[in-house]
Amino acid sequence: MAGRARSRLLLLLGLLALQSSCLAFRSPLSVFKRFKETTRSFSNECLGTTRPITPIDSSDFTLDIRMPGVTPKESDTYFCMSMRLPVDEEAFVIDFKPRASMDTVHHMLLFGCNMPSSTGSYWFCDEGTCTDKANILYAWARNAPPTRLPKGVGFRVGGETGSKYFVLQVHYGDISAFRDNHKDCSGVSLHLTRVPQPLIAGMYLMMSVNTVIPPGEKVVNSDISCHYKMYPMHVFAYRVHTHHLGKVVSGYRVRNGQWTLIGRQSPQLPQAFYPVEHPVDVAFGDILAARCVFTGEGRTEATHIGGTSSDEMCNLYIMYYMEAKHAVSFMTCTQNVAPDMFRTIPEEANIPIPVKSDMVMIHGHHKETENKEKSALIQQPKQGEEEAFEQGDFYSLLSKLLGEREDVVHVHKYNPTEKTESGSDLVAEIANVVQKKDLGRSDAREGAEHEEGGNAILVRDRIHKFHRLESTLRPAESRALSFQQPGEGPWEPELAGDFHVEEALEWPGVYLLPGQVSGVALDSKNNLVIFHRGDHVWDGNSFDSKFVYQQRGLGPIEEDTILVIDPNKAEILQSSGKNLFYLPHGLSIDTDGNYWVTDVALHQVFKLEPRSKEGPLLVLGRSMQPGSDQNHFCQPTDVAVEPSTGAVFVSDGYCNSRIVQFSPSGKFITQWGEESSGSSPKPGQFSVPHSLALVPHLNQLCVADRENGRIQCFKTDTKEFVREIKHASFGRNVFAISYIPGFLFAVNGKPYFGDQEPVQGFVMNFSSGEIIDVFKPVRKHFDMPHDIVASEDGTVYIGDAHTNTVWKFTLTESRLEVEHRSVKKAGIEVPEIKEAEAVVEPKVKNKPTSSELQKMQEKKKLIKDPGSGVPVVLITTLLVIPVVVLLAIAMFIRWKKSRAFGDHDRKLESSSGRVLGRLRGKGSSGLNLGNFFASRKGYSRKGFDRVSTEGSDQEKDEDDGSESEEEYSAPLPTPAPSS
């Protein structure tokens, strides 16, 4: 009895203990109160996905992130959805399991961030993924198996520094599987733990942005290489990606000339993350290298890096882990810093991996998209240089990197051979790589949802060949293009008459190839002065979230960063600036010949005497200390010095939105400006004030408000806003401006996905703001034109921070004059129009001054004014009446003669039919005056009288009159050499 009681007591105590332990157990669901706010009502067809959180034990749980039952309406649709991390404390993702099939999903990307681009249950990814910094956590495509992280390795989320939200992006390539209109709930399941992981995972992306595959070419190599300049990382998995033409992708670590394989795989196999065969560590000073081998066989035209399956891509994703205290979650490489090194690449990298046909079918790209018109890219990816967008938005671009639209870039398709039409790359336009914005389709995505909301984060998701990552600023707001200049509407370039700028093809300076060209200026002798970055590159690893430079260990640039170039021979006349700068940016020259430069890494402004070796004359700002007070800058961009007063104006900058004025001695005077807000920024608001231009005689300072795509002008004395210049053709960015009396020159940035405006230079009438010319280079192409300077004779120089190139442009013959000569060449004499036309040959020494050019424009305006002179209708009427009278007389004579001498055996016709029948040419159903007059006696087109054919009315004239319809055709231009 006592034993039974004892057993019952033990059982009761056990139950109580179990209950208390259950009460003490803190289920993940118990802290998910906020999660209820965003719980989704899934479609009935998605049953089983309605429980997104499942506890595993006291510290671990799974999180299902799935589409809430969607049905894409068109191929190549990108849908995004977000889910908040259901815990406040730090957690770690230690496993992923894809919940998708290639039958419906082309690829998926999972990002971590703190602010999704939308709060809806799902949205078109054209609106972006995140509005702040985002980290890619996972990528899946082509029925890939789950990615396994090594023990002790996890992606850090939550807490004070980790991401609070997950954003899932799903690319639906072929929608034929949705013909039954079923709902899709594809996604990924995460295994999370609260247990701190000693090793933090990250992703290193290597990608090409400028590969061109000629048609029919058997083997084409695309090489990528970058110096590794971070704490050691340990590679444990990799993934390759190309489209149809890729044969093999190989990745290596190069240390002291020795190549160590990271991974090698056929991109035609399922595109999973494959584990490395042997552990590979990468340390400071190593080089990471990758090669993609393509074939152009079977193609009839060149294939470029792009976002459709008929384009190509060359991507290698390296998954790594680092010690938690040094961890960096994402790094990129889009350059080839050591092209000669690939001469020693292991032979295996050049050998395609055989793939069975059934395996190709398993993972093949969707065929229905192959013949689609190639979408314009972009882009650009910035290649680490300055696109003031969050590094995270860069990942949106990654979405394009994973599939048929996975390019980077850019909106405007990168095509190095487009010399006159495009002038811009992919990423970039991936380039360009970057955030998914409208991919060029117009149906379901157009409208307010796309036009107004779609730009919010996409502004940050361009790669601009990935050098434009230049900063990790907050993304610019959505903005609609406005027109505040008189008479502006949908923009059409007025390439009229007497002002046209073209590249000076004889100038050899385009092949100088210094480092990233950040600034250009002209000294008092009209010598070109270049400010460049040598072997330093501004990329996503350059700054932390507080804009503190992270690569001080590299030391200053060990070569001369300021080059004085002969404007004709492009010879280096003088150089300076060694061991002074880390990341050069703006350059200007005052009336005394002093150089004013900015360094975004140092957060400082320097005044330099060109030939002095005693150091700067003046330094503003604190070295390596970003700030926003009177003594600090935050990545200052440019300087302008007023000639009359010596006042110094500094545009500050990437992380401040202001203009700061100093005295000639460097004393703070005043500042103005604030950060832009909303889609319609107000006067005096800036989003990266990037370039300055003084208009001395009007006491105005004009600012290239880069990310707002406009130019703002202010009074230098009162700081009063004067006006805004903004054109649709600017696109979303205005990078740099330069003023000469009467004219304002500007250069824009690469287009975003879905945008049409190419990257190009502009010439504007300063008084009216109207665009009077646009121009692009012939040799090479603009990728990220970063600065512009013009001389008073109309010579223009543009420096590109991505292609490391400087172009020279000069005034050329006016278009009107060329047409005038063409008319004369055709045998028609036209009186010379001397006052309205200016013929300016590129090599003429005495080029017209800017004041003369301004007069030309005024005269052109008078000539074009429709309100002046005799009305056009009256002139036309006076000209037409004599022609009608002569025609009537001729027809009457013809009719009379045919009655007297016509063939009486033919079938009678009405008089009207007889006349019109005679006036018809071969195969014609209307009046042919050429054949009519050709039948008259004494008329000859070739110097001989035509033999009469009136005796045979039933025979049609075998002469089709083509000779009488000859037009003068100018010979086709010789194709420009590709570079």
Curated annotation (Swiss-Prot):
Extent of the signal sequence: 1-24
Chain positions recorded as Ca(2+) binding sites: V520, L587, D787
Ranges facing Intragranular side: 35-869
Chemical reaction(s) catalysed: a [peptide]-C-terminal glycine + 2 L-ascorbate + O2 = a [peptide]-C-terminal (2S)-2-hydroxyglycine + 2 monodehydro-L-ascorbate radical + H2O; a [peptide]-C-terminal (2S)-2-hydroxyglycine = a [peptide]-C-terminal amide + glyoxylate; N-dodecanoylglycine + 2 L-ascorbate + O2 = N-dodecanoyl-(2S)-hydroxyglycine + 2 monodehydro-L-ascorbate radical + H2O; N-dodecanoyl-(2S)-hydroxyglycine = dodecanamide + glyoxylate
Regulation: PAM activity is inhibited by EDTA, phenylglyoxal and diethyl pyrocarbonate. PAL activity is stimulated by cadmium and inhibited by mercury.
Pfam families in the cross-refs: Cu2_monoox_C, Cu2_monooxygen, NHL
Region (Interaction with RASSF9): 931-948
Cytoplasmic domain ranges by topology: 894-979
Primary residence: membrane
Proregion span(s): 25-34
Glycosylation sites: N765
UniProt NHL repeat ranges: 501-544, 570-611, 620-665, 673-717, 769-812
Free-text remark on how the cofactor is bound: Binds one Zn(2+) ion per subunit. Binds 2 Cu(2+) ions per subunit.
Family, as annotated: In the C-terminal section; belongs to the peptidyl-alpha-hydroxyglycine alpha-amidating lyase family. In the N-terminal section; belongs to the copper type II ascorbate-dependent monooxygenase family.
Protein name: Peptidyl-glycine alpha-amidating monooxygenase
The organism of origin for this protein: Mus musculus (Mouse)
Gene: Pam
